[in-house]
């Protein structure tokens, strides 16, 4: 029997009403329960204000590192940028550093940013600098990329003060943050000012054409992040219609023709994530360009499954996979 349609207290449609439909048998069994109480919020101009009101999760207690905020100058003509820093060993020197960009579809801030960066710092024993970049649609491309590059430049220039090794700088993020990280790696390659040793792309948002000029397979994008949300997020970020000919060159990682010379990459996604196909394609293109690349596709995982159901076996395997990749990258320099 199908689950009855239920309304979330905030008025969102619950994904639990979709269980037992045509593609639900593809969801990992341990991930199904988490969908029952998950609000389905389709991103649009009408829902964006409500989405930005969602409360953030509180920081984790000790032994996870405390968090500190710091403001740095933005690019010329741009406002200062807030950085959120997680330091597992204050006062230490010569450490690797991970520059993190949060998810949120380019239009909002991830509500789980605090525990995410605390866990990375603690589990990977690196300084984590998360960039509170400007959001779309208020700021369109290249505003957020300028913020992220300014943060990369600041970390590199202040390595001694931060106690980090400027030869061990990695970039990464989840979802839209993964898209930002890919774009940042491309800019760093093109400008040849700052060496980046690794890009950690966790179910990255890489291609504006998904859901606009290119339809995803029916089994992908049924949960959490769908084609309509993707069109809205990309259009807001780009300042033009997603998938159109007006998209600026270099603004979409998947549209960049030359991927050679980029740092090694780890790309991970769930098999039924809307981004699965574009992530697999990007990984294959990196490999073809001679970029050392590890691709991990986890059966039955929808978008953000590791955050929504962190105790599931597949989620633990996913997290262990990218954490191990980041530690290996830091150890090889």
Residue ranges and their predicted role:
Residues 1-85, 243, 330-333:
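A glycine/proline-hinged amphipathic helix-loop "lid/cap" segment
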Residues 139-160, 322:
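Alpha/beta-hydrolase active-site loop
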Residues 156-171, 191:
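Gly/Ser-rich "nucleophile elbow"/oxyanion-hole loop immediately N-terminal to the catalytic nucleophile
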Residues 267-269:
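Short beta-strand/loop motif that positions the catalytic acidic residue
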Residues 312-333:
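Catalytic active-site module of serine/aspartate enzymes centered on a nucleophile-bearing elbow/loop
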């Amino acid at each position: 029997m199908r689950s009855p349609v239920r309304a979330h207290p905030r008025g969102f449609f619950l994904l639990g009403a979709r269980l037992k439909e045509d593609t639900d048998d593809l969801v990992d069994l341990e991930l199904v329960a988490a969908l029952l109480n998950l609000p389905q919020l389709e991103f649009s101009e009408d829902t964006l204000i409500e989405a930005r009101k969602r409360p953030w999760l509180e920081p984790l207690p000790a032994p996870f590192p405390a968090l500190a905020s710091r403001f740095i100058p933005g690019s010329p003509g741009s406002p200062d940028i807030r950085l959120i820093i997680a330091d597992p060993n204050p006062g230490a020197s010569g450490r690797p550093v991970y520059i993190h960009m949060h998810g949120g579809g380019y239009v909002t801030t991830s509500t789980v940013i605090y525990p995410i960066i605390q866990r990375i710092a603690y589990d990977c024993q690196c300084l984590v600098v998360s960039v509170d970049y400007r959001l779309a649609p208020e700021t369109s491309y290249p505003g957020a990329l300028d913020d992220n590059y300014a943060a990369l430049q600041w970390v590199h220039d202040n390595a001694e003060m931060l106690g980090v090794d400027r030869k061990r700088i990695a970039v990464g993020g989840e979802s839209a943050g993964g898209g930002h990280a890919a774009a940042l790696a491309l800019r760093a390659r093109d400008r040849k000012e700052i060496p980046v040793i690794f890009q950690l792309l966790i179910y990255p948002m890489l291609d504006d054409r998904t859901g606009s000029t290119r339809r995803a397979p029916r089994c992908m994008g049924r949960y959490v992040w769908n084609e309509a949300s993707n069109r809205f997020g990309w259009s807001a970020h780009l300042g033009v219609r997603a998938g159109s000919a007006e998209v600026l060159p270099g603004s979409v990682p998947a549209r960049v023709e030359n991927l050679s010379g980029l740092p090694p990459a780890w790309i991970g996604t769930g098999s039924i994530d809307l981004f699965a196909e574009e992530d697999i394609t990007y990984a294959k293109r990196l490999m073809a360009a001679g970029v050392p690349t590890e691709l991990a596709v986890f059966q039955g995982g929808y978008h953000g499954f590791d955050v929504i159901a962190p105790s599931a076996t597949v989620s633990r395997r996913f997290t262990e996979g990218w954490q191990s990749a980041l530690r290996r990258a830091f150890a090889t320099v």
